[in-house]
């Protein structure tokens, strides 16, 4: 009876969540991190110490933001229909902004690849650069990442159908596959014959794959929080907005990797 009353209570159209300082603090923390990283990469003294501090600061602020959202949705019952629509809209707009960011990276890549300049030797990859074989480690990473998309979809449908154990197992396997993918991406960087400083090819390659790798790490963190909430009985078959947002983000990461593999690895080899 109490459970049913709570469900009916959350169906009203009012927005109960108070204004949050964490989006502003997160923006400031990310600005400090990106500025410190750029200055460090340009050789400015002292910023090599600021970068790890900025990373810790971003993680701390994000942790506080996650804590408030979990408290509002799980313990305070503030995630009404109006709040859930707002959160869904926010996640959707965030992913759209990420799409345009990656679109800029692909634009830079194809701008140089379709019509290589004389400085590049009028060929792609540029003269003197040996691209990574797309049928070796990149193909394995593609299989791993697409498999993680299958396992997280299984976990999602298991949760909807009330199969909590299947949701837990599917999420654990997805996180393990994500860790393996990130490890192999690091191995690929260490064995590569070119660096980010080797012409526009190296810049576009490492910027595109590295930024995607950062998204994989962020998505893994999202799924890890979802796993913890699953284990703590925070999620139900009808109320799992944060978990669902993490899954949507993960599918976005999958799709971006497919475009990277086809264009940067396969076509650009």
Swiss-Prot record:
The keyword NADP does not apply. Component of the cytochrome c oxidase, the last enzyme in the mitochondrial electron transport chain which drives oxidative phosphorylation. The respiratory chain contains 3 multisubunit complexes succinate dehydrogenase (complex II, CII), ubiquinol-cytochrome c oxidoreductase (cytochrome b-c1 complex, complex III, CIII) and cytochrome c oxidase (complex IV, CIV), that cooperate to transfer electrons derived from NADH and succinate to molecular oxygen, creating an electrochemical gradient over the inner membrane that drives transmembrane transport and the ATP synthase. It comes from Emericella nidulans. InterPro entries: Cyt_c/ubiquinol_Oxase_su3 (IPR024791), Cyt_c_oxase_su3_dom (IPR033945), Cyt_c_oxidase-like_su3 (IPR000298), Cyt_c_oxidase_su3-like_sf (IPR035973), Cyt_c_oxidase_su3_a-hlx (IPR013833). This is Cytochrome c oxidase subunit 3. GO terms for biological process: mitochondrial electron transport, cytochrome c to oxygen. The chain crosses the membrane at residues 24-44, 46-66, 90-110, 138-160, 167-187, 207-227, 247-267. Its main location: mitochondrion. It is an enzyme of class 7 (translocase). Component of the cytochrome c oxidase (complex IV, CIV), a multisubunit enzyme composed of a catalytic core of 3 subunits and several supernumerary subunits. The complex exists as a monomer or a dimer and forms supercomplexes (SCs) in the inner mitochondrial membrane with ubiquinol-cytochrome c oxidoreductase (cytochrome b-c1 complex, complex III, CIII). It is found in: Mitochondrion inner membrane. One of its GO terms (molecular function) is cytochrome-c oxidase activity. Pfam families: COX3. It catalyses: 4 Fe(II)-[cytochrome c] + O2 + 8 H(+)(in) = 4 Fe(III)-[cytochrome c] + 2 H2O + 4 H(+)(out). GO terms for cellular component: mitochondrial inner membrane. Keywords: Membrane, Mitochondrion, Mitochondrion inner membrane, Translocase, Transmembrane, Transmembrane helix. SUPFAM superfamilies: Cytochrome c oxidase subunit III-like (SSF81452). Its EC number is 7.1.1.9.
